Regions:
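DNA polymerase processivity clamps
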Residues: 1-49, 53-105, 120-240
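Glycine-rich, pocket-lining loop/helix-strand segments that form or immediately flank
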Residues: 108
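Bateman (tandem CBS) regulatory domains
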Residues: 115-119
Length: 240
C-alpha cells in the first residue's frame, strides 16, 4: 500500500525529457530509517517520504515512469509486502507470487533537497477542495497557451484572478482563509497547481511563500498526515 501510494503521489510530476532522461522517472532515495520517492519536471517537484519501509542502508535508484505505472496498477490489486532488490542497472520487485524485473534509468538525479524551501514565512492554510474548485473555475478564463493565474494574498484573504486579453476574458474570486504574513502576489500555471491539489488526499493544505519570485512549498496540514509525508514545490511564473 505504501509503495503504491508513493508512486501515485509522485508519478504525475515526472518529465518527458530526451535531454535529461533521469527526470523521466521516480527517484527512490533510501536512508537507514526512511524512504523518499521524488519526481520533478523542473516546474514542479514532489516528494513522498515514509518511515514504514525497512531499509538495509543508504542507497538510491531511478525507476522509469512506465514500469512504475505498471507496478502501481498491480500493487493496487495486491496488498502484500513488497521486497525490493537492485543493482546498478536493474531492480526486482517481489510480492506474493509475482516478481517484476525493471531496467533502471542510469544517471544522476537532480539534488532535490537543495530546492526545497526551508524558511518561507508567509503561510496560507486553506481547505483543499475549496481552493481546487476555485482555481478550476478561474482558470477557465486564463490564456489557453499559458494557463496563468495569479494569487494575491493578504491577511485573512486570498484573491485568485486570471485573464485572456486576446479574447477579453477575465475571472476573479475572493476567498476568506487563514493567511499570515506579508502581502504576496504570485503567479502559477493553473494546470500544475490543479495537478498538485488533485493528488493530495488531505482536507487542508498549507502553502508557504517567501515572496512572489521564489518557489512555493505546498504540504498537507499536520493533522492530515498519515503513513506518508508529502511535499510539493511549485515554481512561480511572472504575471502582471
Amino acid at each position: 500500500k505504501v509503495l503504491a501510494e508513493g508512486i501515485s503521489s509522485t508519478i504525475y510530476a515526472t518529465a518527458d525529457d530526451e535531454i535529461r532522461p533521469t527526470m523521466n522517472g521516480i527517484f527512490f532515495d533510501m536512508d537507514t530509517d526512511s524512504a523518499t520517492l521524488v519526481a520533478t519536471d523542473s516546474h514542479k517537484l514532489i516528494c513522498y517520504t515514509t518511515k514504514e519501509a525497512k531499509v538495509s542502508g543508504k542507497s538510491s535508484f531511478i525507476l522509469h515512469k512506465k514500469p512504475a505505472a505498471v507496478l502501481k496498477s498491480v500493487l493496487d490489486r495486491d496488498d502484500t509486502d513488497v521486497k525490493v532488490a537492485f543493482d546498478s542497472s536493474t531492480v526486482v520487485f517481489t510480492f506474493g507470487e509475482t516478481m517484476m524485473v525493471c531496467r533502471l534509468i542510469v544517471g544522476k538525479f537532480p539534488e532535490y533537497r537543495r530546492v526545497i524551501p526551508q524558511n518561507n514565512a508567509n503561510i496560507l492554510r486553506i481547505d483543499r477542495n475549496q481552493l481546487l474548485a476555485t482555481v478550476r473555475r478561474v482558470a477557465v478564463c486564463a490564456n489557453k497557451a499559458s494557463n496563468h493565474i495569479k494569487l494575491d494574498l493578504r491577511q485573512g484573504q486570498a484573491e485568485i484572478t486570471a485573464q485572456d486579453l486576446g479574447f477579453a476574458l477575465a475571472a476573479y474570486e475572493k476567498l476568506e482563509c487563514d493567511y499570515n504574513g506579508d502581502p504576496v502576489s504570485i503567479g502559477f500555471k493553473s494546470s500544475f497547481l490543479i495537478e498538485i491539489l488533485s493528488n493530495m488526499a488531505c482536507e487542508t493544505v498549507v502553502m508557504k511563500f517567501a515572496d512572489g519570485r521564489r518557489a512555493a512549498l505546498i504540504v498537507p496540514s499536520e493533522e492530515d498526515e498519515e503513513s506518508g509525508k508529502i511535499c510539493a514545490i511549485l515554481m512561480p511564473i511572472m504575471v502582471s
